[in-house]
């Protein structure tokens, strides 16, 4: 199957889906250190070779992709994937050790952290969008999510039209922030859209009655519900407002680094190891998210297609 045919197939699948519905061999991680010198135009792999360290961006509260546990240790699906990449870099460069430095980032500063050289990989829950592709590069898709609404069951919110004239919370710097502002203008819903600093703050706004709904990628919403004191008080509702592939984010024009990342992911996909990692985080007693058809396609035919619409 040609690349163009695969691309058309994925676009059809995306449209239908939206409308119808430290590495084990690496050294232990150290606390975040001072930001590296900006690296525009510098060979990142050479810097890693010289310093024996790679700074990766992580999130504090993007369960189960990238979060800090009770012992303040970075964990998650995306973190595990980046540790696989770190191990591959260590091997490819012939390094006896490679220190993984965890640098906290937020939706608001993650792209700047890459561009300024504070991190070499962003390992969170970042969607691959056309707008972001203008500023950064994305590795192969590792998850496919869709934006839905989180609301209290008692609110009787069932979809976007129920939000007319109501207060809605979005997380700053996310695709859902722009999407909801666009929908608000296009449909003249007169929503009061408030912006929170992170997903935990957005969830609290709904929990405390300061907003009736929180639009975000469904898997992130399920993760927040799983951690709530009363998960059954909440529901993820409505049709998909968009479909968004997640991927590891890198600086543009880092062709050698990008090649290592994609080779590592291709190996995980082809060997089936990706299913073990998926089940580790998405098929648990705490959180169960079935592998959806779009992600199966992404594992079978690795790609960097952006979000739809």
What are these model-derived regions, one by one?
Residues 1-11:
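Bacterial N-terminal signal peptides that target proteins for export
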Residues 55-64, 74-91, 127, 145-199, ...:
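Bilobed "Venus flytrap"/periplasmic-binding protein-like clamshell domains
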Residues 60, 143-154, 218-219, 226-265, ...:
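Periplasmic-binding protein-like
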Residues 108-109, 123-134, 179-186, 207-242, ...:
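A ligand-binding cleft/hinge motif common to bilobed small-molecule-binding domains
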């Amino acid at each position: 199957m040609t690349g163009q045919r695969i691309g058309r197939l994925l676009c059809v699948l995306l449209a239908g889906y939206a409308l119808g519905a430290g590495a084990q061999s690496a050294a232990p991680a150290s606390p975040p250190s001072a930001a590296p010198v900006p690296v525009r135009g510098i060979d990142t792999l050479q810097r890693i070779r010289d310093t024996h360290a790679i700074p990766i961006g992580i999130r504090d509260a993007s369960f189960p992709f990238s979060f800090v546990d009770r012992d303040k240790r970075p964990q998650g699906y995306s973190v595990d994937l980046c540790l696989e990449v770190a191990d591959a870099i260590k091997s490819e460069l012939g390094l006896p050790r490679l220190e993984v430095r965890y640098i906290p980032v937020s939706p608001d500063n993650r792209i700047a952290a890459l561009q300024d050289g504070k991190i070499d990989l962003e390992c969170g829950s970042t969607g691959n969008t056309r707008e972001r592709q203008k500023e950064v590069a994305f590795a192969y898709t590792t998850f496919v999510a869709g934006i839905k609404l989180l609301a209290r069951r008692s609110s009787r919110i069932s979809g976007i039209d129920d939000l007319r004239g109501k207060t809605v919370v979005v997380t700053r710097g996310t695709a859902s922030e722009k999407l909801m502002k666009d929908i608000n203008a296009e449909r003249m819903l007169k929503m009061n859209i408030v912006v929170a600093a992170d997903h935990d703050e957005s969830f609290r706004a709904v929990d405390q009655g300061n907003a009736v709904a929180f639009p975000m990628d469904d898997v992130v919403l399920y993760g927040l519900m799983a951690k709530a004191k009363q998960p059954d008080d909440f529901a993820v509702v409505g049709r998909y407002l968009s479909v968004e592939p997640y991927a590891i984010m890198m600086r543009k024009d880092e062709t050698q680094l990008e090649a290592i990342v994609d080779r590592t992911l291709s190996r995980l996909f082809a060997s089936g190891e990706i299913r073990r990692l998926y089940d580790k985080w998405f098929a648990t007693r705490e959180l169960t998210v079935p592998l959806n058809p779009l992600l199966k396609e992404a594992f079978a035919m690795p790609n960097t297609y952006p979000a739809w619409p």
